[in-house]
Amino acid sequence: MAEVTDDEWKDLLNLIRKLEMCLKSVFSADLCNWSCLMNSFFKEPEPCPHLHIHVRPRYRNPVVINGNTYSDDSFGHHYSTKKSAPISIEDMQAVFIRMKSWLNS
């Protein structure tokens, strides 16, 4: 991460702000956890490390998508890397469409 230029940091900050606003506006996320895990690249015989960032929106209250309720049972704590219940393809598509609509507005 130390190799990221000042201009790249500014661009990244703008993307982070926009994505957080989207998640808070569209799904009422209370906050977002961000992570950058570089060690996975070194599992390969010829690693090609690059900046790879994950965002995990966190929710105090359940979120309803297409009538299905999703709860963040570990809100306020570290989350497990194991998914307790996968999101359906239909709900995943609804999330994508709603976020895309907000980001393009």
Regions found by a protein language model. Give the residues of each.
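HIT superfamily nucleotide-processing domains
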Residues: 1-105
